[in-house]
């Protein structure tokens, strides 16, 4: 009986210990970002043969929109209603053919695009991810490609638009980068 009691105590102690350990394991909520542009209608300045405008928002990163001629070319997405947004992703053709310069505009009507919410002139990424410092709202989102690297036509697999809680990270300042002012007498 004594052996049985010790076994029960050992099992209970182990169970309680495991419960404490397991309760310390962090649990992360899965966050999913909804692509506001998914399956929405795209309008474009030009399209080439078997690479039509609908490929830009079809959710398939194996189909693409392409133009026969080079920049400046544009595509705008009608989201169907006004949304807040702050993150944009563009999936360009490949590592040697991508937009090196582009602008993104957001509007509630097709007549007044205003100033771009983002202008990029130094892109070197096949997947361009842009996060704004603050959210903007609108029904229409326009991607204007002004320069391409590689082949001259514009070629993009997907244009994704998100409303996310992500924040732009502040730059990290290093004390070694800060200099004291020089005093002169």
Where are these regions (language model features)?
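Trp- and acidic/polar-enriched beta-sheet ligand-binding modules for extracellular glycan
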Residues: 44-48, 68-74, 92-165
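Hydrophobic loop/turn residues within beta-sheet-rich immunoglobulin-like superfamily modules
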Residues: 79-82, 135
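Intrinsic disorder/low-complexity segments in short proteins, especially the signal peptide
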Residues: 17-19, 41, 84
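Sec-dependent N-terminal signal peptides of Gram-positive bacterial secreted proteins and lipoproteins
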Residues: 3-27
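Disordered, acidic Ser/Thr/Pro-rich linker "stalks" and the adjacent N-terminal cap
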Residues: 27-80, 93-98, 151, 160-185
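Exposed beta-strand and adjacent loop surfaces of beta-rich binding modules
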Residues: 39, 85, 99-103
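Beta-strand-rich structural segments
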Residues: 87-90
């Amino acid at each position: 009986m004594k052996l049985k009691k010790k076994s029960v105590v050992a099992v209970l102690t182990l169970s309680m210990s495991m419960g404490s350990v397991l309760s310390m394991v962090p649990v992360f909520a899965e966050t999913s970002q909804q692509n506001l542009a998914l399956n929405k209608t795209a309008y474009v300045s030009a399209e080439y043969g078997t690479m039509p405008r609908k490929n830009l928002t079809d959710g398939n990163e194996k189909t693409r929109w392409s133009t026969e001629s080079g920049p400046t070319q544009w595509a705008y997405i009608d989201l169907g209603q006004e949304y807040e947004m702050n993150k944009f992703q563009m999936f360009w053709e490949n590592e040697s053919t991508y937009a090196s310069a582009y602008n993104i505009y957001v509007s509630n009507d097709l007549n007044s695009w205003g100033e771009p919410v983002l202008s990029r002139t130094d892109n070197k990424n096949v997947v361009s991810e842009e996060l704004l410092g603050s959210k903007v709202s609108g029904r229409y989102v326009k991607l204007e490609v002004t320069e391409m690297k590689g082949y001259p036509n514009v070629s993009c697999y997907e244009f994704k638009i998100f409303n996310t809680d992500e924040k732009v990270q502040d730059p990290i300042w290093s004390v070694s980068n800060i200099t004291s002012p020089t005093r002169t007498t």
